[in-house]
Structure formats: C-alpha cells, structure tokens
Design a protein with these regions (language model features):
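Juxtamembrane "helix-exit" motif on the non-cytosolic side of transmembrane helices
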Residues: 34-43, 103-114, 177-191
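Small beta-barrel nucleic-acid-binding modules, principally OB-folds
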Residues: 120-136
Length: 230
C-alpha cells in the first residue's frame, strides 16, 4: 500500500519539475548567449536580464502550482499541519536564486571563463540539492514521524554521491569545451543547441533519480526495514 508521504512526494513531482524548468531555461539561454557573440542579445547586461526574467516568470508559476498541489494533497490525506504549505512558497523563491546569481556573474564576469564555470557549478548544485530538501519539507508537512533533515540527506548522499560526482565530471568539461569554442570563434548554433540539450538531459536524470532515492528513504523509514534499492 502506498503511504501518505510517498503519495505526497509524487504529488510534488510535477510542481518540482515546473520550478526546475527555470534552471533549464537558464542553461539554454546562457549557452545560446555564450555562442552567439552578442547576436542573441546586444550585450551581456541584456542577456542577464532576459535570463533572470525567464526564471522569475517560471518560478512564480511554479510557486503558485506548488502551493495548489500541496494544499490539495494534504487535504486528501487529512493532514493537520496545513500551515506548513506556506514553506513551499519560500522554496519556490529559493529555486530562483541560482538564476539571479548566474545573471550577476554574467554581468560582472563578461567573458572570463571562471565565471562561466562557477555558473555551471551553481546550477548543478542547486539541481542536485534542492530537490531532496523540497521533498523532505513535503514529507515533514504531512508525516510528523518522517526522518529528520540530517538523516534523509545522509541517506541520500550515501546512495547518490557517485552520481553527484559523475554529474560534475560530465558538466564541467562540457562548459569548458563550450567556452573554448566561443573563445576561438568556432562555435555554431548546432553546438549551442547540443550543449543546452545535453545539460537538460543531465538535469532531468538527476531529478528523477533524486526523487526515486528519496521515496525509497521514506518507505524504509515507514516500514522500519530496508527495501529494494535502485
């Protein structure tokens, strides 16, 4: 039988993907901006503004939908702590922070490679770390006996650290390759789209696996014994 916390985790998947789309939009626009040498936007300031605007719009939609879905899920589960729903709006805002930081780095960093690499690192870290924190907050809102934040993150890290490291091993060289192409004037729209596509696929896989591992952690806590791992 599917437990309440597992139902709640899955009810938040769609909402999580919505605000997660803000990060994907950042990756796509940032990559195109890097490869078009000012053709997409007149200057980096305009590009940074566009990236931040896209993120704010998607983040706002995500916050509204997340609030609605979580409220509905808690009502169906007869939860008592509906005041915790407001915490999810905070997470919707948190989801927009990487975009703001990336925009600032683009504006002040110009064509400096370390700033592009740091931007990629921030996006990757946000995509990997915010998802388990989100589903943990949802679990605590409905299940007062759910694992503590430390235990759920420790469990997640023990199962997920190799994938986390593999992601950065793949994403950082990809960013460096993109910067190199841009620096030597050999970038093409095809390469830009391919780079954005690969990054999006990596983010998508990271999200699905993180949610799956978190669900397993909750089920193990509820049944009191290990269940089948991924």
């Amino acid at each position: 039988m599917t437990t309440d916390s597992v139902k709640l985790v899955f009810s938040g998947v769609i909402s999580t993907q919505l605000w997660f789309a803000a990060l994907l939009a950042n990756v796509g626009v940032m990559t195109l901006l890097a490869f078009t040498d000012g053709e997409l936007f007149p200057n980096l300031s305009g590009g940074a503004t566009a990236i931040l605007s896209i993120s704010i719009i998607l983040g706002a939609i995500a916050s509204i939908v997340t609030h609605w879905k979580l409220t509905r899920a808690m009502a169906l589960a007869h939860a008592d702590e509906q005041g915790d729903v407001g915490a999810w709006i905070v997470w919707g805002v948190v989801a927009m922070l990487p975009a703001a930081i990336i925009s600032i780095l683009l504006y002040i960093g110009s064509d400096k490679q370390p700033f592009w690499l740091l931007s990629s690192f921030i996006s990757g870290a946000a995509s990997c770390l915010l998802v388990p924190l989100l589903v943990h907050a949802a679990g605590c809102a409905i299940n007062r006996n759910s694992p503590s934040r430390n235990s759920i993150i420790d469990y997640w890290w023990s199962r997920y650290k190799r994938l986390f490291v593999a992601y950065f091993i793949a994403s950082v060289p990809l960013t460096m390759f993109s910067d190199a192409l841009d620096h030597y004037g050999k970038s093409t729209p095809t390469v830009a789209v391919f780079s954005a596509f690969v990054s999006s696929i990596l983010y998508f896989i990271i999200t699905l696996l993180t949610i799956a591992v978190t669900v397993i952690a909750y089920r193990e806590a509820e049944v009191g014994k290990p269940v089948s791992a991924i």
